[in-house]
C-alpha cells in the first residue's frame, strides 16, 4: 500500500509541488513487520535528506524483491544490496540493524502515531492536519494540497 502510494502518487506530487518548494513532505516510519522495520532502520542511518528520499523511493520501487524471503537474514541481505548504492556498506548496515536506540525511536514513533492520529491503515496521509486513509489517486491529493496554496 505505501509502495503503491509512493510510486504512483508521491512521485508525481514531488515533481509538481515538492521540487519547486511549494509544499513540505515528511516521511514517518510505520513498519508493520520485521522486514519493514529493518528497512526503516537502515533508512534512518542515511544522513542526507535527499539521499534518504532517493533510497526510500528505491526501497518502495523494489519492495517485492526484498520484503519476502525464507528468513530475516535473507531479507536483510536483499535490503543491503539496495542500500549499498546509497553510501551504506554492509558494516554500517549491520550497525544500523543493531542500533537499539534507533529501533526504539522507530517503534515509539509508530505507537505514538497510532494513538495520537488514530492511524489504522497505511498509507495514511495528512495534509494540513486533515487525514486521508485508504485508496486515493494523484488528482485527489493534488486538489487537496492546492486548496492550501
Spans of model-derived segments:
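Short, contiguous strand/loop micro-motifs
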Residues: 1, 66-67, 96-99
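Structural alpha/beta surface segment adjacent to cysteine/selenocysteine redox centers
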Residues: 3-84
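C-terminal cap of thioredoxin/glutaredoxin-like
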Residues: 7-10, 81-149
Amino acid at each position: 500500500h505505501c509502495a503503491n502510494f509512493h510510486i504512483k502518487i508521491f512521485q508525481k506530487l514531488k515533481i509538481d509541488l515538492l521540487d519547486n518548494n511549494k509544499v513540505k513532505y515528511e516521511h514517518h516510519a510505520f513498519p508493520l513487520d520485521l522486514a519493514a522495520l529493518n528497512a526503516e532502520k537502515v533508512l534512518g542511518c542515511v544522513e542526507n535528506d535527499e539521499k534518504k528520499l532517493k533510497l526510500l523511493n528505491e526501497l518502495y520501487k523494489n519492495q517485492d524483491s526484498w520484503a519476502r524471503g525464507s528468513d530475516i537474514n535473507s531479507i536483510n541481505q536483499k535490503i543491503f544490496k539496495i542500500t549499498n548504492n546509497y553510501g551504506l556498506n554492509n558494516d554500517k548496515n549491520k550497525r544500523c540493524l543493531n542500533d537499539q536506540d534507533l529501533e526504539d525511536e522507530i517503534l515509539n514513533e509508530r505507537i505514538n502515531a497510532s494513538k495520537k492520529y488514530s492511524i489504522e491503515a497505511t498509507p495514511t496521509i495528512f495534509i494540513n492536519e486533515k487525514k486521508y486513509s485508504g485508496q486515493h489517486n494523484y488528482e485527489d491529493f493534488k486538489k487537496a494540497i492546492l486548496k492550501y496554496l
